[in-house]
Amino acid sequence: MAEEQEFTQLCKLPAQPSHPHCVNNTYRSAQHSQALLRGLLALRDSGILFDVVLVVEGRHIEAHRILLAASCDYFRGMFAGGLKEMEQEEVLIHGVSYNAMCQILHFIYTSELELSLSNVQETLVAACQLQIPEIIHFCCDFLMSWVDEENILDVYRLAELFDLSRLTEQLDTYILKNFVAFSRTDKYRQLPLEKVYSLLSSNRLEVSCETEVYEGALLYHYSLEQVQADQISLHEPPKLLETVRFPLMEAEVLQRLHDKLDPSPLRDTVASALMYHRNESLQPSLQSPQTELRSDFQCVVGFGGIHSTPSTVLSDQAKYLNPLLGEWKHFTASLAPRMSNQGIAVLNNFVYLIGGDNNVQGFRAESRCWRYDPRHNRWFQIQSLQQEHADLSVCVVGRYIYAVAGRDYHNDLNAVERYDPATNSWAYVAPLKREVYAHAGATLEGKMYITCGRRGEDYLKETHCYDPGSNTWHTLADGPVRRAWHGMATLLNKLYVIGGSNNDAGYRRDVHQVACYSCTSGQWSSVCPLPAGHGEPGIAVLDNRIYVLGGRSHNRGSRTGYVHIYDVEKDCWEEGPQLDNSISGLAACVLTLPRSLLLEPPRGTPDRSQADPDFASEVMSVSDWEEFDNSSED
């Protein structure tokens, strides 16, 4: 008894924890579930504690009732749902083969399933009967690993028989990815017309050009030889031609098709597509499902900028973050502008670059504007601004694009211009009450907000809101810190102000503080600060994450290729794939790009100093810090 009392005293713990961090802990074993399965398998192998016999095709299989009930809804309903099988020692199983039942029981006891071409169908039938989703998924994945042009129709029939929507989607994806080759097979013409119509209507259809869709629609009704020899009748066009997006075809191809067609509904459709090409300035206002890109790849894209190499170069290249590779790639298009710090807007998946800087030999503000069409990878120069705007902000509100304030390197501006894509024209709207440049803008709930910037040599922390309905500006609460040459983004009904610099310390320093504005409360707050300086950054929002691209750091005294991504749910920054060079003044956005661009092999960047005689005049041999003199950020 004395020993017992002594032990109790030695082990006595306080009734209440005195340490503030002392709390109850829960421990979880990562090995417990597998150990439990091994124990149950050992019981099965030893023939211990069996309490039910399954009778399948006249053969007996012993099992543990509680494990079966825990494994799937079918057995749970049988053994725990008040049915007569609860009391039976032997239970008859219908609609399942003996071999498949053995396979499924092995999976229940081990979590392992061995599939082959000889057993997959009967295993799938049994899994559907017994309602075991995991085994159904395994069988579907196994079938997909063996799908080819010869057996795909059989697998489609299997998916339809058991209502396997996931398998049907996988088969659809197989055809969408291999459409050009599959459309030249006999099996293609054996698919139901409704199925082919659905596939040809999909944005996920992988083709290099819309002409391949046109040919695929014809190949459902004609042989390849007939299509190639033009031995087809289009007076009453096949229904599948309704899925062809004729405006996405090249104008030359459309013209040849139009010239050989007799008067018919199809000829009228082709004529409308030709008119779309001829009215290039009005294309953004002529958008319809017929002009939608066949792609679901939304990418962060950056245009222009000025980058640091052995010399300082204004870029006319675009770069995009390839979602398949997780790295930055370049693409080029003819007549691309070569500038930096341009205002950027996206409307109907067209990119607009507005004004900006052409600071090659001194400071020069721009009034010229461009539009990029990813459907045809072409640039088009639209109507110029009515005056030059550098260090401006650009926003889309409704169907209009607004260019707000800035400077022309002689005067600071308060002018606001509005662009109407339907008329390709600019018009002045209500100006700001005072001049501002190097500010940033964003749109939220049909209104336009601009923040901070500079006026003369002074850094600002002002916030202004434009209401297009009343054509008026309103002043809101000041932000928490002065800054200029920063970026703004709208995310989850809040405005974020990111990056930039100020001289509050008596000299130019990066601003790491990130400010968040709530339109509901009208108040500013601070969130997780930037891990590095980003002045003149590119800003884009994709999948509820803010991308901050490149820029320049006054703390480091250089441009940067860093990419930082803000996760609003976790309130933290993470590093993204770094840009391939240090660049500032990048105009960034999110754009749907064609699959052909993302899937084509990477190409090297040509040496334009050899290919372009004008290129040499745009190169300056100065140090990395000295070339900041020609940056927008003075």
From Swiss-Prot:
Domain named BTB: residues: 50-117
Pfam families found in the cross-reference section: BACK, BTB, Kelch_1, Kelch_KLHDC2_KLHL20_DRC7
Sites of N-acetylalanine modification: A2
Compartment(s) of residence: Cytoplasm, Cytosol; Cytoplasm, Cytoskeleton, Microtubule organizing center, Centrosome; Cytoplasm, Cytoskeleton, Spindle; Nucleus
Region annotation (Disordered) ranges: 600-634
Stated consequence of mutating P20Q: Found in a patient with isolated coloboma; uncertain significance
First and last residues of every Kelch repeat: 299-349, 350-399, 400-446, 448-493, 494-544, 545-593
Subcellular location, principal: cytoplasm
GO CC, one annotated term: intercellular bridge
Residue numbers carrying Phosphothreonine: T463, T475, T605
Keywords, sorted A to Z: Acetylation, Cell cycle, Cell division, Cytoplasm, Cytoskeleton, Disease variant, Kelch repeat, Lysosome, Mitosis, Nucleus, Phosphoprotein, Repeat, Ubl conjugation pathway
Example GO BP: negative regulation of type I interferon production
Composition bias, Acidic residues: 624-634
Residues recorded with modification Phosphotyrosine: Y466
GO MF terms held by the record: 14-3-3 protein binding; ubiquitin-like ligase-substrate adaptor activity
Note: Potential oncogene that is up-regulated in breast cancer cells and promotes tumor growth.
Role summary: Substrate-specific adapter of a BCR (BTB-CUL3-RBX1) E3 ubiquitin ligase complex required for chromosome alignment and localization of PLK1 at kinetochores. The BCR(KLHL22) ubiquitin ligase complex mediates monoubiquitination of PLK1, leading to PLK1 dissociation from phosphoreceptor proteins and subsequent removal from kinetochores, allowing silencing of the spindle assembly checkpoint (SAC) and chromosome segregation. Monoubiquitination of PLK1 does not lead to PLK1 degradation.
Protein name per Swiss-Prot or TrEMBL: Kelch-like protein 22
Organism of origin: Homo sapiens (Human)
Annotated gene: KLHL22
